[in-house]
């Protein structure tokens, strides 16, 4: 999110899922909290375009813009920044653009400490409440009032939150660990809008810190003892900043302004964070329309969740199988991704798909993964799936992704041998896949084997 440059500030998707599961009685949507990366292993790939982890968050309902705009003017941080700007008037500042004696305004304005004053000063200057020119601070061009358009007030609020979160690099909350994991904590609270218990938040931060920062046991023991108190202080500050409030159950959750601001940040980072209205339009699409929209990238991953929830698992699977059985590799790949969201309730149409020449291998794999009776796949079947997987990515128009996908198909397996075996499977896109590998694969031996295999396939 805003502090994504910090290497310790990571999204541990597995831990987010487990944290959400601990809600127990929460809504299905909240507990599912579909937080999936499009390519979870891309961090190990050097291909262009790989390595960017895109997350999908459940749809949210935002408060109306006019209500949000009115709430901005009541945020304690905003009110104090206005007071500081008024107190400053016309005043000399240091060469760094700071107030020369931070203790004076702290005493006169009742600001608890210089760190809080610095946050207020950053917000006041960056948002235009205060202007600094030639070593002198004066009143800035921004005059906040309820007369401003909602869009202007929300734009101001967006800037305030970016300033707040950027301060995490310089001890925003007073806890270095909370600062390091602030973005993922806010994203988790965004995904579970009803709130999370402090104990759950502490557990998530500890687990993420241990994994992402490779913390030693002694550090973890000390952190386990100190973090609950540090988190309480951090939540109090975030409440002062207008981001956090307590739910009816006493659990911290994002305020309506917090939901709006965190969503803006997620969208800036390229994540899928839709509103309910944005994805509701996909519920009534047919399977063919949904698959086409996904392939054209006009439907975000969250649209799949809405589409599946609007029909029974069996009905959804039957529609999807029909598309995949008669469609292209690109359609099969897209359908396969959607089918992975379904459980054993969809068994009947998947079992029926075992009679479809282009679909039976995927159906067998789907059944096997869910511990349901299924025919065994031979090595030749695995090679066919490899060809089809690469072909699906070609249909989606991303050759670099295809290179990454090929490297991940069979970790540790001799890729040259797999390429050579591709000529023996009956797949309409075999030559196109071999041409792709021959032209773009980073391993010279694999590329050479692919070009040779393509010539062999053409000679048949």
Q: Regions from the language model: what does each represent?
A:
Residues 365-419:
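Alpha-helical adaptor scaffolds
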Residues 2-223:
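Short, amphipathic alpha-helical interface elements at domain boundaries
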Residues 251, 327-328, 355-361, 426-427, ...:
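Short inter-helical turns and helix N-cap capping residues of alpha-solenoid HEAT/ARM repeat scaffolds
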Residues 271-304:
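Charged, amphipathic alpha-helical linkers/stalks
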Residues 237, 242-280:
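C-terminal engagement modules used by replication, chromatin/transcription, nuclear envelope/ESCRT
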Residues 204-207, 292, 300-311, 322, ...:
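Structural detector for internal amphipathic alpha-helices that build alpha-solenoid repeat scaffolds
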Residues 235-237, 241, 271, 285-288, ...:
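Amphipathic alpha-helical scaffolding segments comprising HEAT/armadillo-like alpha-solenoid repeats
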Residues 120-127, 226-245:
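Basic amphipathic alpha-helical segments that dock to polyanions
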């Amino acid at each position: 999110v805003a502090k994504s440059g910090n290497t310790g500030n990571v999204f541990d998707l597995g831990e987010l899922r487990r944290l959400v599961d601990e809600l127990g009685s929460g809504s299905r949507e909240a507990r599912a909290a579909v937080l999936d990366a499009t390519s979870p292993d891309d961090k190990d790939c050097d291909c262009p375009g790989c390595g960017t982890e895109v997350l999908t968050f459940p749809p949210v309902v935002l408060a109306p813009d006019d209500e949000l705009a009115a709430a901005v003017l009541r945020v304690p941080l905003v009110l104090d920044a206005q007071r500081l700007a008024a107190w400053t008037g016309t005043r000399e500042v240091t060469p760094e653009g700071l107030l020369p004696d931070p203790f004076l305004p702290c005493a006169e304005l009742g600001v608890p400490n210089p760190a809080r004053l610095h946050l207020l000063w950053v917000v006041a200057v960056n948002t235009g409440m205060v202007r600094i020119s030639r070593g002198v601070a004066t009143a800035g061009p921004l005059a906040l009032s309820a007369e401003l358009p909602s869009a202007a007030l929300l734009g101001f609020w967006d800037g305030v939150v970016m300033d707040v979160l950027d301060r995490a690099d310089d001890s925003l909350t007073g806890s270095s660990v909370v600062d390091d994991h602030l973005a993922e904590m806010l994203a988790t609270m965004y995904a579970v809008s009803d709130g999370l218990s402090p104990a759950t938040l502490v557990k998530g931060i500890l687990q993420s810190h241990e994994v992402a920062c490779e913390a030693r046991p002694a550090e973890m023991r000390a952190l386990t003892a100190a973090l609950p108190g540090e988190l309480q202080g951090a939540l109090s500050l975030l409440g002062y900043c207008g981001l956090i409030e307590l739910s009816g159950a006493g659990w911290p959750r994002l305020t309506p302004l917090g939901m709006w601001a965190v969503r803006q940040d997620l969208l800036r980072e390229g994540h899928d964070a839709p509103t309910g209205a944005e994805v509701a339009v996909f519920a009534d699409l047919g399977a063919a329309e949904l698959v086409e929209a996904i392939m054209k990238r006009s439907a975000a991953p969250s649209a799949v969740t809405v589409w599946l929830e609007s029909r029974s698992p069996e009905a959804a699977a039957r529609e999807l199988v029909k598309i995949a059985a008669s469609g292209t590799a690109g359609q099969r790949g897209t359908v396969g991704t959607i089918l992975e969201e379904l459980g054993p309730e969809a068994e009947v149409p998947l079992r029926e798909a075992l009679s479809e020449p282009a679909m039976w291998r995927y159906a067998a794999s789907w059944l096997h993964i869910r511990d349901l009776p299924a025919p065994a796949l031979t090595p030749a079947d695995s090679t066919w799936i490899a060809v089809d997987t690469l072909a699906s990515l070609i249909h989606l128009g991303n050759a670099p992704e295809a290179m990454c996908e090929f490297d991940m198909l069979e970790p540790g397996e001799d890729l040259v041998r797999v390429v050579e075996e591709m000529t023996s499977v009956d797949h309409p896109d075999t030559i196109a896949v071999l041409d792709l590998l021959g032209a773009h694969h980073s391993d010279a031996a694999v590329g050479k084997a692919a070009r040779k295999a393509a010539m062999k396939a053409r000679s048949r």
